[in-house]
């Protein structure tokens, strides 16, 4: 607040604002009085009741004055000076309100305080006559849980009620009477209740008369309109009524709820249709009881009138008042033209009918006098009721229409009789009506006229046809009884030739949030005896009802007097309705029950209003911007008046003399007095604000006039010109409408601003200047585009005729004074007229700035804003000149080229017609014309031309050595040429022009000045690297392809998307114009109606590196590419399991063909081939296994088994010899039976289908050892591919990634550089993929970016560092080593899973792992040269920990008998922990299959022996008794071992050994075995209580017991895996002996027999 005061003081001097002047109502005293006893505090707001008033000061204090009977102390009842309401001190009140005898205030925290008379509960206090001091009112929303206090924004008070508007824009009411809008019969209402009928709508303002209420509500956006229910939500009556007549059916959809609930236009949206039904539908309710019994008496309803559907409809409309919806679509009639023609005949016939019926309807005079509205209002209640009585739904041809017409006439006669009982409106003269039939005819014509005007009501304010002209009163010459036919059909026929132009919706987001909405509705409720509700009748309403005729009138403020209402519009007009006894409505037209324009001043617009008891005040704009005050209403009785009971009033509003007072900012009206708040004009600040507000409101009126009188009629013409012309003009009109709406909103906000604190920093034009600057810029752009394309010269003859007829109007509106000016120039001046307003803004803001100190922030902001508007005005002026320059250029340009080059947004910058620029090396007679537009450089030659878009154009000056002084090099994606200028100055001019144009084209904007910044800051040179879109036309590979992405010096470079016309698309990175890096490529396959899809790496425009290619046929290849071909290691999946030939190949490719080692899985045949390939065929050594257990290894030729081979069947039958085809024996060989018998000789035939043998049968001697039997078994693997030859491509690829052409040949530093690059590149690519890296993965990648550095001698610590690095590297496929391991795991699983899970392949699988270890170890030693070779020893930096007990001696001794000299470096020790866990499942499965038979024997013995208790088993196994545990410690308790005890002895050792199955590597498994031995020693030591020495004879039975109790299912597989993969140096050490013991136990268990 301090800063606010300071700013105000600087601008104004001191305390010269908010002065209070009071007039007596009706006295017209020339000089108003200053409020008695009032000091000098600035008053922001005042409110007046019948005999009292309140003032709100700038510092948030409230003062009461007048008669205050509710005060407790006598001195305060009639205070001599305004009395401070001490109860409100410190609460900072922001708004006040008064009713007739009570007051209210709202604090800045949204709390309401009430005081004064409370007989009707209007102060929200129960059972209390008066509330002497302001007391807070509790308002809480019961719908929320817990109850939330409702914050209030505004307050309005009537005589017996109060309304509050909450911050969520809902109305809360309390007090007494129907004016509360609450559904209740219990009064008074002392607890504030929500007015539910308006819940969900945005209420902008509330106002209270004595006994009626008004609300200003924001219109619903179109999408918020909801579909219709079948019945009314409030009274449960049908929304569409149907009455079955003798020959037709009458349907009415104009339901109006008796509670005063009207339907929204869309809710009445039901098509009228022909219905023929023998059973008439009737409504339930015959009427509703009002709280006001007088209203019920006035209705005077007879029972006979409520029997027919038409009468029911009429009754409902009398009670509830609704209008036939005008937003409905026309029903689908069979033949609209027939109906239209028929209607014409019908209209001629009905004129005669009218004359014949003249005598029959003499009683309608009062009705017509009340109901005829002026042209501007939609139909009133009576007309609406009449119209909806008889809506015929005949099929609209022939007899049906005639029948409807006749029956309708009878219905209408009934209605007339019904209406004649309604009372005449009070105050309406009775002798001025014309004769009945003529009046009725006028009424029906008016109705049809209104229906057609409201025709297709758009919810957008920008519908050009929506706002009717406010002037003339033409009427259509259609007969009255045409209402028999559906009014929709009439509307449709009336607007057949009208162009529908719906322009930009006015919901502009930001502007609507910051400025008051003009899309408003007025809702009224309460008592309506004087017509103050505006519904065309005098009936009360229990609930809010929309005053439809104010829709689209842009009402921005409401005021309610004692029994009349005022609505102020954005166009500075006032609509008034209600009691006009004293002329308080400002006009003398009837009826006064509907809103009509007040005739305040023909020249001045009204910007503020106040309504008192019997009078109104209008604050108007004057020529010198000082507000003038008009008074309209009651006058006090003059001296000697003999008729005091007939008080007089004004016939027209009277201007009060108040110019000497100062600038009135607000007027307030009470009963007998009214007051004005006045500001003195110190330093011109107030005058400048009023000038801004007045000119803005006048500007809006001017724009509205242009829209309604020029644009709307122009756009509604049938033939405007070409499609382009219409589009351009519609764009102009749309932007114009948007600007117009913004100006209207701003004018309304300025009116509110003048009534407030008037702080400079809160001016919308300064605070949110971008709203205005953008709107003006958009509008100017659309007008300039229209002008460039020829402007008004494009318009067709009907448009030109219209403009010629209205030339005087055009001249007047465009402010062109010269009568000789051409029509086109006038139209251009009119379109550019709004731009002038920017200069006015700049001027007024500058004026305001001078009222402040130069150092103040206000001065700076106002100065900056003024500069913004001025610079934009100059800029838009420049844009207009550019448009005119471009237009004149097109007029001289050759016609054919104009059509192709002329575009609305294209502007000419410069051209070389004066030969200032020429093409280097051009022919002697060639003509080269260069034209620079804002979006392209055009090179024209004779009749041809070429367009170079600026976004993809690079210009640079040539150096003197290469091209002379005046050369300019122009580079485009497909052209490169040199331009020579005539002089160095010309060269500089062209270079600057081209560079500036390119820069603007790239930024996507013209050279608009930066808002709030300098407009001179220009980038001199456009960037060499940029984003742009281009379509190639020349390049053979890229012809007609479109590229959108990054460029560098004329070539695609960086990320981009390239699309070919045939549907091919590449999306990825480019380098020097070619695909290079990572990208995605799609190629449509029209034959299969699918597409090929490649995602992966590219090099120089070709697929190169890792990628995935998905073929349209369903095949998928994942692997390496080179020159668009599969080359290197890859996986090809063909088909799926459900398809005809599913298969999978993984292996090496050369030039798009399988070559080298690969594995082929033929899923259909159940065979897997593992061997060599050449030219897509199996060639060389290989192995085949089948799902039936057959195993073949040998030679292949052209996909067939050919040459030497070995074949094994599942039952161990072996053939070793020659083959000629798949599974076909042919030649010399040996067949060995499972029992060892064998046949040597010649074999021919297919295996499994009979083999022809010529040879010798051998039966081995019984004395031959078993070892000699399976000779072939020992030969297995000799004809398979050597392990080191497998997957060479995988390892070669890894070496290549490290920068080595062959294994081990390369620089280490270069390898590490490549690793860093790979990690960075892969991470960047991974960011674009949908998979998100976890935090741990990200940390792993970050740690891998550090290269391990090793200086000095190699140690165990360095060895551990390398081990840790390898574990991390192999964990991420983004690292070359990680990718290698991932690929090896994939190929290993692919080989040995499924059909490959064959026990014959175990040795191959083991060899393969050993080969992996050897080859990876070579890679690791290359990266870490200091790592010793295989089998070397690393000295220990610290001695072995002392105190470890040797299991052999059982003693604790620091001196080991065979101390390890150091740590042995082996490939398996380093790499198996990384590799084996990943390969373990398939490998262990092979071990299990291979040891299947002996495992079964072992397991059977284990299960059998484990049935015995511990003591029995120990005895059976021969364990010495001294080692038997006597007692056991279980959960801390010592328990004796009983004969029945089971699974208790050596339990810790058993548990330890069971963990062998959870480990992967042999070293880990050996550690488990070692730990088990130690646990056994500990257990024995605990029972013996003394040192002892193990001997193998003692140890073996105990360990055997532990192995049995451990119950390891696949112990044989575990033993064999350790044996195959353990480091050789461990075999003779301690762990080797322990392992041998375990192996002995395994074989011993198989031979144990239980006695």
Swiss-Prot record:
Domain PH: 895-1001
Region (Disordered): 444-476
SMART domains registered for this protein in UniProt: MORN
Modified residues (Phosphothreonine): 504
Biased composition (Polar residues): 450-461
MORN repeats by residue range: 1043-1065, 1066-1088, 1094-1116, 1117-1139, 1145-1167, 1169-1191, 1192-1214, 1215-1238
Modification N6-acetyllysine occurs at: 527
Keyword hit for Phosphoprotein: yes
Residue ranges of domain VPS9 in the record: 1507-1651
RCC1 repeats: 59-108, 109-167, 169-218, 519-570, 572-621
GO cellular component terms attached to this protein's record: axon; centrosome; cytoplasm; cytosol; dendrite; dendritic spine; early endosome; glutamatergic synapse
Gene Ontology molecular functions: GTPase activator activity; guanyl-nucleotide exchange factor activity; identical protein binding; protein homodimerization activity; protein serine/threonine kinase activator activity; small GTPase binding
Residues modified to Phosphoserine: 459-460, 477, 486, 1329
Keyword vocabulary terms for this entry: Acetylation, Guanine-nucleotide releasing factor, Phosphoprotein, Repeat
Residue ranges of domain DH in the record: 684-879
Disulfide bonds: none
One GO term (biological process): vesicle organization
Subunit note: Forms a heteromeric complex with ALS2CL. Interacts with ALS2CL.
Function: May act as a GTPase regulator. Controls survival and growth of spinal motoneurons.
Protein name per Swiss-Prot or TrEMBL: Alsin
Protein's organism: Rattus norvegicus
């Amino acid at each position: 607040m301090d800063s606010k005061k300071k700013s105000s003081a600087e601008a104004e001097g001191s305390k010269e604002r908010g002065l209070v002047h009071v007039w007596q109502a009706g006295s017209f005293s020339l000089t108003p009085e200053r409020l008695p006893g009032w000091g000098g505090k600035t008053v922001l707001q005042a409110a007046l009741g019948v005999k009292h008033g309140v003032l709100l000061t700038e510092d948030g204090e409230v003062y009461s004055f007048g008669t205050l009977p509710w005060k407790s102390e006598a001195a305060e009842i009639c205070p001599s000076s305004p009395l401070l309401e001490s109860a409100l001190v410190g609460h900072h009140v922001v708004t006040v309100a008064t009713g007739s005898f009570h007051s209210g205030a709202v604090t800045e925290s949204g709390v309401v305080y009430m005081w004064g008379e409370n007989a009707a509960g209007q102060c929200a206090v129960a059972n209390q006559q008066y509330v002497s001091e302001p007391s807070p009112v509790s308002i809480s929303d019961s719908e929320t849980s817990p109850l939330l206090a409702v914050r209030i924004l505004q307050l309005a008070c009537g005589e017996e009620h109060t309304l509050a508007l909450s911050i969520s824009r809902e109305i809360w009411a309390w007090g007494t009477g129907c004016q509360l809008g609450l559904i209740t019969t219990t009064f008074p209402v002392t607890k504030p209740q929500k007015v539910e009928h308006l819940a969900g709508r945005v209420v902008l303002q509330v106002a209270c008369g004595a006994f009626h209420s008004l609300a200003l509500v924001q219109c619903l956006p179109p999408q918020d309109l909801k579909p219709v229910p079948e019945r009314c939500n409030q009274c449960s009556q049908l929304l569409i009524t149907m009455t079955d007549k003798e020959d037709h059916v009458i349907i009415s959809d104009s339901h109006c709820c008796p509670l005063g609930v009207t339907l929204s236009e869309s809710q009445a949206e039901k098509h009228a249709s022909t219905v023929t039904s023998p059973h008439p539908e009737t409504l339930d309710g015959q009427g509703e009881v009002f709280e006001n019994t007088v209203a019920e008496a006035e209705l005077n309803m007879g029972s006979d009138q409520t029997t027919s559907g038409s009468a029911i409809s009429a009754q409902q409309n009398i009670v509830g008042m609704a209008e036939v919806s005008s937003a409905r679509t026309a029903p689908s009639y069979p033949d609209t033209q027939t109906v239209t023609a028929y209607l014409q005949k019908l209209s001629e016939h009905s004129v005669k009918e009218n004359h014949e019926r003249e005598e029959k309807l003499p009683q309608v005079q009062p009705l017509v006098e009340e109901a005829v509205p002026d042209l501007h209002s939609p139909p009133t209640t009576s007309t609406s009721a009449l119209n909806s009585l008889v809506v015929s739904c005949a099929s609209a041809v022939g007899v049906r229409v005639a029948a409807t017409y006749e029956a309708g006439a009878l219905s209408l006669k009934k209605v007339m009789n019904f209406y004649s009982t309604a009372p005449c409106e009070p105050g309406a003269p009775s002798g001025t009506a014309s004769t009945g039939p003529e009046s009725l005819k006028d009424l029906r014509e008016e109705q049809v006229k209104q229906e057609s005007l409201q025709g297709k009501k758009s919810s957008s304010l920008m519908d050009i046809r929506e706002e009717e002209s406010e002037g003339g009163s033409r009427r259509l010459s259609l007969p009255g009884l045409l209402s028999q036919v559906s009014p929709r059909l009439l509307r449709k026929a009336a607007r057949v030739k009208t162009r529908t132009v719906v322009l930009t919706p006015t919901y502009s987001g930001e502007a609507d949030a910051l400025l008051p909405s003009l899309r408003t509705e007025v809702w009224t409720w309460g008592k309506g005896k004087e017509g103050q509700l505006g519904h065309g009748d005098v009936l009360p309403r229990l609930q809010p009802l929309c005053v439809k005729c104010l829709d689209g009138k842009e009402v921005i403020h409401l005021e309610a007097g004692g029994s009349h209402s005022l609505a102020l519009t954005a166009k500075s007009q006032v609509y008034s309705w209600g009691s006009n006894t004293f002329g308080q409505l400002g006009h003398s037209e009837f009826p006064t029950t509907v809103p009509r324009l007040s005739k305040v001043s023909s020249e001045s617009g009204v910007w503020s209003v106040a309504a008192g008891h019997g009078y109104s005040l209008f604050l108007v704009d004057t020529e010198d911007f000082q507000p003038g005050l008009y008074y309209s209403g009651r006058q006090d009785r003059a001296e000697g008046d003999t008729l005091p009971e007939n008080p007089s009033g004004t016939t027209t509003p009277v201007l009060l003399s108040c110019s000497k007072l100062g600038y009135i900012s607000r007027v307030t009206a009470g009963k007998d007095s009214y007051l004005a708040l006045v500001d003195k004009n110190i330093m011109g600040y107030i005058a400048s604000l009023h000038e801004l507000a007045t000119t803005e409101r006048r500007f809006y009126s001017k724009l509205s006039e242009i829209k309604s009188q020029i644009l709307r009629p122009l756009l509604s013409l049938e033939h405007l010109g070409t499609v382009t012309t219409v589009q351009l003009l519609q764009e102009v009109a749309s932007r114009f409408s948007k600007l117009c709406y913004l100006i209207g909103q701003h004018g309304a906000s300025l009116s509110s601003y003048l009534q407030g604190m008037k702080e400079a920093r809160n001016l919308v034009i300064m605070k949110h200047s971008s709203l205005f600057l953008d709107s003006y810029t958009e509008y100017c752009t659309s007008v300039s585009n229209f002008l460039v394309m020829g402007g008004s010269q494009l318009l067709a003859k009907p448009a030109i005729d219209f403009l010629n007829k209205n030339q005087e109007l055009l001249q007047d509106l465009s402010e062109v004074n010269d009568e000789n000016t051409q029509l086109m120039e006038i139209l251009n001046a009119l379109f550019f007229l709004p731009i002038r307003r920017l200069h006015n803004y700049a001027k007024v803001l500058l004026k305001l700035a001078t009222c402040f100190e130069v150092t103040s922030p206000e001065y700076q902001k106002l100065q900056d804003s003024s500069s913004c508007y001025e610079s934009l005005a100059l800029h838009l002026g420049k844009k207009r000149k550019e448009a005119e320059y471009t237009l004149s250029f097109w007029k001289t340009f050759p016609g054919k080229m104009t059509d192709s080059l002329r575009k609305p947004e294209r502007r000419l910058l410069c051209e070389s017609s004066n030969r200032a620029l020429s093409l280097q090396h051009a022919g002697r007679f060639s003509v080269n014309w260069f034209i620079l537009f804002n979006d392209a450089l055009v090179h024209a030659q004779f009749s041809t031309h070429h367009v170079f878009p600026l976004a993809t154009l690079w210009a640079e000056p040539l150096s003197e050595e290469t091209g002379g002084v005046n050369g300019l090099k122009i580079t485009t994606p497909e052209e490169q040429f040199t331009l020579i200028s005539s002089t160095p100055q010309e060269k500089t001019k062209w270079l600057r022009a081209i560079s500036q144009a390119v820069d603007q084209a790239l930024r996507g904007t013209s050279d608009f000045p930066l808002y709030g910044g300098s407009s001179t800051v220009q980038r001199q040179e456009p960037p060499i690297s940029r984003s742009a879109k281009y379509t190639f036309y020349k390049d053979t590979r890229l012809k007609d392809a479109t590229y959108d992405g990054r460029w560098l010096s004329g070539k695609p470079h960086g990320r981009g998307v390239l699309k070919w016309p045939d549907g091919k698309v590449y999306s990825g990175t480019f380098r020097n114009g070619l695909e290079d890096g990572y990208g995605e490529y799609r190629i449509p396959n029209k034959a299969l109606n699918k597409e090929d899809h490649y995602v992966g790496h590219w090099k120089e425009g070709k697929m190169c590196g890792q990628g995935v290619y998905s073929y349209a046929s369903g095949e998928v290849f994942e692997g390496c590419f080179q020159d668009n071909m599969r080359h290197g290691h890859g996986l090809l999946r063909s088909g799926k399991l459900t398809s005809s030939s599913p298969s999978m190949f993984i292996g090496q490719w050369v030039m798009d063909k399988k070559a080298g080692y690969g594995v082929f899985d033929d899923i259909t045949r159940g065979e897997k081939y593992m061997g060599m390939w050449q030219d897509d065929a199996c060639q060389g050594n290989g192995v085949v296994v089948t799902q039936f257990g057959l195993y073949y290894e040998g030679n292949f030729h052209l996909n067939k088994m050919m040459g030497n081979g070995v074949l094994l069947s599942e039952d161990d039958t072996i053939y070793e010899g020659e083959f000629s085809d798949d599974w076909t024996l042919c030649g010399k060989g040996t067949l060995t039976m499972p029992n060892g018998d064998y046949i040597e000789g010649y074999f021919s035939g297919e295996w499994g289908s009979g083999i022809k043998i010529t040879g010798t049968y051998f039966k081995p001697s019984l004395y031959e050892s078993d070892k000699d039997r399976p000779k072939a078994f020992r030969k297995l693997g000799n004809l398979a591919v050597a392990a080191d030859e497998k997957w060479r491509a995988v390892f070669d690829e890894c070496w290549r990634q490290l920068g080595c052409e062959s294994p081990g040949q390369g620089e280490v530093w270069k390898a590490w550089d490549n690793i860093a690059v790979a990690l960075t590149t892969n991470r960047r690519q991974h960011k674009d993929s949908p998979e998100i890296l976890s935090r741990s993965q990200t940390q792993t990648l970050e740690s891998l970016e550090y290269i391990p550095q090793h200086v000095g001698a190699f140690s165990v610590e360095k060895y551990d560092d390398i081990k840790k690095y390898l574990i991390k590297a192999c964990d991420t496929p983004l690292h070359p080593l990680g990718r290698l391991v991932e690929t090896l795991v994939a190929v290993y699983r692919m080989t040995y899973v499924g059909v490959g899970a064959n026990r014959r392949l175990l040795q191959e699988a083991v060899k393969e792992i050993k080969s992996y270890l050897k080859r990876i170890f070579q890679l690791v030693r290359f990266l870490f040269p200091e790592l010793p070779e295989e089998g070397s020893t690393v000295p220990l930096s610290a001695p072995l920990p002392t105190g470890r007990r040797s299991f052999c001696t059982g003693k604790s001794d620091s001196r080991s008998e065979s101390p390890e000299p150091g740590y042995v470096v082996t490939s398996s020790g380093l790499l198996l922990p990384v590799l084996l866990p990943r390969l373990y499942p398939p490998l262990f499965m092979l071990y299990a299959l291979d040891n299947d038979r002996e495992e079964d024997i072992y397991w059977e013995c284990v299960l059998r022996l484990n049935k015995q208790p511990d003591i029995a088993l120990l005895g059976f196994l021969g364990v010495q008794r001294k080692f038997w545990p006597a007692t056991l410690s279980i959960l801390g308790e010592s328990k004796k071992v009983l004969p029945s005890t089971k699974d208790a002895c050596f339990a810790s050792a058993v548990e330890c050994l069971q963990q062998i199955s959870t480990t992967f590597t042999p070293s880990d498994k050996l550690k488990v075995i070692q730990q088990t031995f130690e646990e056994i020693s500990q257990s024995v030591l605990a029972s013996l209580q003394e040192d002892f020495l193990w001997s193998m004879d003692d140890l073996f039975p105990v360990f055997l017991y532990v192995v049995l109790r451990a119950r390891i299912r696949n112990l044989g597989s575990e033993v064999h895996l350790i044996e195959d993969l353990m480091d050789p140096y461990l075999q003779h050490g301690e762990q080797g002996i322990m392992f041998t013991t375990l192996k002995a136990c395994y074989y011993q268990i198989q031979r144990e027999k239980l006695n």
